[in-house]
Amino acid sequence: QRQMCIRDRHIGSGGSLTGPMMVLKALTSYQTPHIQIDFIGNADSSDLQAKLRKLDPATTLVVIASKTFSTQETILNAETMKKWMLERLGPSSLSKHFVAITGNKNRANSFGIVDENIFEIWEWVGGRFSLWSAVGLTIVLGIGSENFKEFLRGARAIDEHFQNTAPEMNLPLILGMLEIWYTSILNFGSRAIIPYDHRLQNFVSYIQQLEMESNGKSVDKLGNKMTKKTAAVVWGAEGTNAQHLSLIHI
């Protein structure tokens, strides 16, 4: 069995971690045979060390996703993986077993990653949307290129729906207006996401990060202090596990 340890963390917000994690869990039934993907995001080394004990360096690919290639947590875990690999396979392992997804090619080169193993992302790509960019390499490894293309076609379909559909039938617009109504007008401060499919268990953390980073602002574009709430606290749990959170029923 071919094992791949995917080390994936977005600068500051975790977008390139939560996105691929959510998608790959949701599309488990499309998983590429003989490829095992592990996500390493926390600076606490216990998770990484536990995974390293199970890995064969000869069959391990390390994908480092960082827009600036300077995030402390990212580089800390990347350096640990690098040391582990060099001790077992020597200097040549860097060109064979390490891939970077970044907007800072020079820093990736300085780390030891060769040009042909660097997938560049544009400056305007935010981490919370990065799963549609080169960060999606992790998803390609997990479900295969054809399934990933189908995934992109689905994303394009909803983009075109948003751009071309009249307001009264426009799903993203309606959901956005409802969010403003409940959060900024009715002043609700909490929103629970409860997916009733086990494969969507990571959807909660993805939406939490997506919305609370995008809309969680205390000032407007001109620097003026906001007088209304801009976002609710997003939380939740998987399916019937959430029924034991008694407060949600009150």
Model-assigned labels for residue ranges:
Residues D8-M22, F129-G136:
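Conserved phosphate/anionic-ligand binding catalytic regions in large, soluble enzymes, centered on
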Residues S13-L17, A43, T102-N106:
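Short glycine-enriched loops at secondary-structure junctions
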Residues R2-I6, I250:
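Short, small-residue-biased leader/transition segments that mark boundaries at the very start
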Residues R7-G12, V62-T68, S190-D197:
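Short glycine-rich or small-residue beta-strand-to-loop segments that form or flank ligand, phosphate
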